[in-house]
Amino acid sequence: MVALRFFFFSSLLILLILSQALIMSVGSASQIRLSSTFSIQEATIEDIRVAFNEKRLTSKQLVELYLEAISKLNPILHAVIETNPDALIQAEIADRERDLKNTTKLPILHGVPVLLKDSISTKDKLNTTAGSFALLGSVVARDAGVVKRLRESGAVILGKASLSEWAHFRSFSIPDGWSARGLQGKNPYVLSANPSGSSSGSAISVTANLVAVSLGTETDGSILSPASQNSVVGIKPSVGLTSRAGVVPISLRQDSIGPICRTVSDAVHLLDAIVGYDPLDEATKTASEFIPEGGYKQFLTTSGLKGKRLGIVMKHSSLLDHHIKTLRREGAIVINNLTIPNIEVIVGGTDSGEEIALLAEFKMSLNAYLKELVKSPVRSLADVIAYNEEFAEQEKVKEWGQEVFLTAEATSGMGEKEKTALQKMKELSRNGIEKLIEENKLDAIVTLGSDLSSVLAIGGYPGINVPAGYDSGGVPYGISFGGLRFSEPKLIEIAFAFEQATLIRKPPKFIA
């Protein structure tokens, strides 16, 4: 008990010192700066690009600034599992390319650092472990599809972000943001608050200005929820719009890779870089046909709410009332008190069939992923379970268990029970959100936080979260806009217009 008290008060003192230092840095000339004209605090992709072009900043210097910020704050936040040993080399290459080429013709992400959730594979010196020691030292065959596109855009891979271990699919008892490798991620606004997950580190890193932009993954809520809890923008694309090849999977039917950034425009620029056909992910073939010519940045318009029909579909708190007024003021037609049939069944997860299907899909998908690894200490879900039992203390099995793993391992493929579950989800989607949107001619549905993530998840629908405020204790919350498959253009218009009309986001203060 004495040791615990000493640790607690020592940690608190460190937090207070770091917090005060960061607050002072944000509000004064003592900010972390390269020069008197550039700061990484809240810097957007456009800010960085302009600084590059004006010779006020190099990519190498930018990477150094982010690495410095990580070294100072990551011992408290546990947002980054590891940084890339080659990040500075990549940045130097980008700087040389910028000197040799017409900068106006370089991709907008050229030389910009990106952090990846630790379930997204990279064929380099970085590990890809889903936060588990079971995969430490494994070697992937190739970059994930989205990473390949990032490299082609000239982005610098800064490192791997922490996450809820195995994307929160080892045990539902594991706290959001915890993994054996990454430890417990902290919410930068209120350190004792839930950072959410499973893309916790991606959201924490971005909101704490440890990186410019990041990528997360979502099966059900894992982008939208941490984005909401950490006052950042998260885009969960329609399933298939971004490749899942090379990503530690849960369900190819529901998994989606998307941006987590501080602004809608940054998220859209990152989305533009990662969408497209990948022969290693069959779902991208059909989805790529819906990518608009010229990309998604053309939908970044401040008039994006004008004439949009938006539906409020769940009982909402007074926190949303103010924003409903804003939406209407900006020209949207807001229809209140709408109902999605069987919403309680969908949100519940078990009765909808989602959990039944995910368990079987996870075992099949993970086994396939592990077998494709060039080198790995584990080759199947059964191997991972055995590893956790052997190294139970390291993986905190006694504390958190692995009941989801065990239940998934007991499945035997897509049997009648699983097929019935899949059919039920299709019917719930068809008779639920699809019918609601079509009958009311809606452009999007609206909710606080990620309350409708399961509605979007089971149908492969897209969603965007935008910062919407802070509660009385300083904990952030967001507003989410969801729509039918491939309705990203409308959702981006709505989200960007809302963001620009409110400009609610503010940097964290690290309240202990």
From Swiss-Prot:
Residue positions of the active site: K117, S198, S222
Swiss-Prot/TrEMBL keywords: Hydrolase
Tissue distribution of the protein: Expressed in vasculature of roots, cotyledons, leaves and sepals.
Gene3D superfamilies: Amidase signature (AS) domain (3.90.1300.10)
Pfam families: Amidase
Top-rank lineage group of the source organism: Eukaryota
Alphabetized GO MF terms: amidase activity
Annotated SUPFAM superfamilies: Amidase signature (AS) enzymes
EC number: 3.5.1.4
Catalytic activity: a monocarboxylic acid amide + H2O = a monocarboxylate + NH4(+)
InterPro entries: Amidase_dom (IPR023631), AS_sf (IPR036928)
Family: Belongs to the amidase family.
Protein name (record): Probable amidase At4g34880
Lineage: Eukaryota, Viridiplantae, Streptophyta, Embryophyta, Tracheophyta
